[in-house]
Amino acid sequence: MTTLRLLISDSYDPWFNLAVEECIFRQMPATQRVLFLWRNADTVVIGRAQNPWKECNTRRMEEDNVRLARRSSGGGAVFHDLGNTCFTFMAGKPEYDKTISTHIVLAALNSLGVMADASGRNDLVVKTPDGDRKVSGSAYRETKDRGFHHGTLLLNADLSRLANYLNPDKKKLAAKGITSVRSRVANLTKLLPGITHEQVCQAVTEAFFAHYGERVDAEVISPDKTPDLPNFAETFARQSSWEWNFGQAPAFSHLLDERFTWGGVELHFDVEKGVITRAQVFTDSLNPAPLEALAERLQGCLYRADMLQQACEALLVDFPEQEKELRELSAWIAGAVR
């Protein structure tokens, strides 16, 4: 009986793909070796312990319909589009060894005519006339009896967009999370013009089979039919939730300041698990009462643009004469925290 399992996703939904990965990892027999191949449409994927407001330009992501997905492994933030091929290798312990999966990916690249080397703990690099360039980054997760290694291969990713979404706005954001390192990267199409996702998947699959000396048929995972994976619906609901993707952020503080025609405003937030635990306001407005009331109302509020807007607009009942100021304030706060 084979110990290998090969899964290929035909979904571009990052929450779907990460939920599939999580379910397979939790439920696989300890004797199984798994290869899961997938890719995501426009998404910023952050590490388990990262702060999205620090790592990402969340406002631009929202404007461009780019999703945020928090993975279960550590490490930094990356931008995925359909120019990335994603891979996940899973195995039980003691057999799990990320050097084996790294070797398989390097063998796959070699079969395509690309000589790459492992660099540091997480990267694969190729030599170019301009120096070493990263073509793959990885992250890892281990539990008591199993582990996985997942990563991306840059085929034809839009590298300019990568810079757009991973460069946060210059805000006064003092955070305790991990800051991603911006790396020099290159697409494999520079070395192999015309290379496709399907060709790369085939090369990785063949290297996987060759290493273990076995072959299996691929299982295609599709959102058109709910995957036959125990607890998939619950896992997908969690993976796609605001509470997981944003609310798991480490504690951080945020200072917003702006000058309006009616006065200057400074708002100080302390945020834990996506909830405002403390809000302070400073202003030289001649009528500070609405702002003082807002600071009280914001404590316990989710750190989300729509929730902050609701808190501002709720004050219109008590301060109707300040409607113009409150609507200006509401629009500014919502824009500043996106």
Swiss-Prot record:
Q: Offer one example of a GO biological process linked to this entry.
A: protein modification process
Subcellular localization(s) per the UniProt record: Cytoplasm
Question: Which pathway or pathways does this protein act in?
Answer: Protein modification; protein lipoylation via exogenous pathway; protein N(6)-(lipoyl)lysine from lipoate: step 1/2; Protein modification; protein lipoylation via exogenous pathway; protein N(6)-(lipoyl)lysine from lipoate: step 2/2
Q: Which GO terms describe its molecular function?
A: ATP binding; lipoate-protein ligase activity; lipoyltransferase activity
Reactions accelerated catalytically? L-lysyl-[lipoyl-carrier protein] + (R)-lipoate + ATP = N(6)-[(R)-lipoyl]-L-lysyl-[lipoyl-carrier protein] + AMP + diphosphate + H(+)
Give every BPL/LPL catalytic domain span.
29-216
Query: Which keywords does the record carry?
Result: ATP-binding, Cytoplasm, Ligase, Nucleotide-binding
The protein's matches in CDD domains, at most eight in alphabetical order, are given as:
LplA (cd16443)
CC per GO annotation: cytosol
Annotated residues that bind (R)-lipoate are located at K134
- Role of this protein: Catalyzes both the ATP-dependent activation of exogenously supplied lipoate to lipoyl-AMP and the transfer of the activated lipoyl onto the lipoyl domains of lipoate-dependent enzymes.
State the family named in the UniProt similarity comment for this chain: Belongs to the LplA family.
| Quaternary structure (record) | Monomer.
What the entry lists under NCBIfam families is as follows: lipoyltrans (TIGR00545)
Q: What's the protein name? A: Lipoate-protein ligase A
Taxonomic lineage: Bacteria, Pseudomonadati, Pseudomonadota, Gammaproteobacteria, Enterobacterales
